[in-house]
Amino acid sequence: SCGPGHPDPAAAPHPSTAPAGSAPGDPGTVGPAADGHSGPKSERSLPGNPDWEITDPGPDGAIEGFADRVSVLPGETFGLHVSTPAAAFTVSAYRMGWYDGARARLVWRREHVPGGKQAAPHVDPATRTVLTGWQRTLAVDTAGWPEGAYLLRLDAEDGSGRRYVPLTVRSASTAGKAVVMSAPATWQAYNEWGGYSLYNGPTGGLATRSLKVVFDRPYDYDHGAGLFLVYEAPLVTLAERLGLPLAYTTGIDVAREPGLLAGASAVLSLGHDEYWSPEQRANVVAARDAGTNLAVLGANCCFRRVRFEPTDLGPDRTVVCYKDAWAQDPGHRSGAPATTDFRVGPGADPESSMLGVIYDGYPVDAPYVVTSPGHWAFEGTGVAAGASFPHLVGVEYDRVDTGFPTPRPIEVIAHSPVVCEGRHSHSDTAYYTVPSGAGVFSTGTMRWVEALEARGPGGGRADHGIDSHAGDLVRQVTENVLRAFAAGPAGRTRPALDNLAGVYGTA
């Protein structure tokens, strides 16, 4: 039946016309450096490097790696753990953004790094966790690297293979900025490198899935990029093109640092941000209640409750989520919250109290239907009531459901009929405001960020048949929301006008 559960984690890898090879360069910092005192605008004005994109990754095992930090502050050092049979490889650090359409800038490169094949992974039988035990290949100093979302590109120098390693160079302060909050815990939950994820094991089902997964392994999806390219990079591109004051962090950092979001104008949760710890959620809610806006640009957000544990490489490198087997979790027996869905017991705390909407199921593929064209989020789109955009709702969706805790006033501005395995429901785009002045905007569809890429008759980089008309809508609405949220507490000038009585017959 339609309900919680998951398909393949993302669309097919993006088509590209970029060359597979790597441009020559010297070891160390490459290209013009941004002036660290003149802000992100100077970074965006620098020329980009379109050769970042991998078109031919080569065979499995040709080269792969991971970083021993999910994020670093500028100037910190991290380790790269790389396995390749090639005698040497090149590593290039690309900061992702707009860069006049190039979408990335080469910040640093090291050539002729000695290669070596690392040991085969093994599996912890107690939790079915894939462990590598790989040795550090290279220490990388990020001095001079601007804050941002990065892809490190590994190129075997014999031409046999290419892979990515994602990294966030995070912001020490978020005050006055819209915070791009990457979701590496969700990337890792879906990562099947080594044959196991939080969804599947060798049998392809839940019975043999991992109960814990670790960041001490490569990502198997999208040539090592995890879910970043489909669910996050298009938003980074748009936000940087708009020239907004941005900060960068991850959900893991938000969980670890209670004051990290102090003074932020907005927090941006991207296309697939499913796995949260209670600490991350509490800190985002505290920011909302202090006037920080929240944009949820996807669906299925904050559905799973997790715990972070260390590995030998450092803190918070294990994602624990026992799900239905929560009672077997030794951590829970020792007093930690159950690592299961937020909405179920013990300690049920439905995510709708933060999001306004709540995850309602998958799989769906449905048109997106505008119902409040006069809402400020639709300014400049020219849409009318009933305007429909095929395939924009999917594959997972959210709705307003007052059977769960729902903030009021809340305004549903798109109310899209869906049929999920025979069950009729709706996907809702909703906006609510709170006494602090903060506004919370939730799209209600997981395809929102990917649809930012939809251009031309074939949809361009977007998948699922999403066309340029949907792309134009999503780009304009997202720009409206980002600009409004970057300007300060949106509820002070754009209070939500509750319309649930008209939409759902709910008082």
Cite the ranges covered by each PLM segment.
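Proline/serine/threonine-rich low-complexity linkers at boundaries of modular beta-sandwich domains
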Residues: 40-62
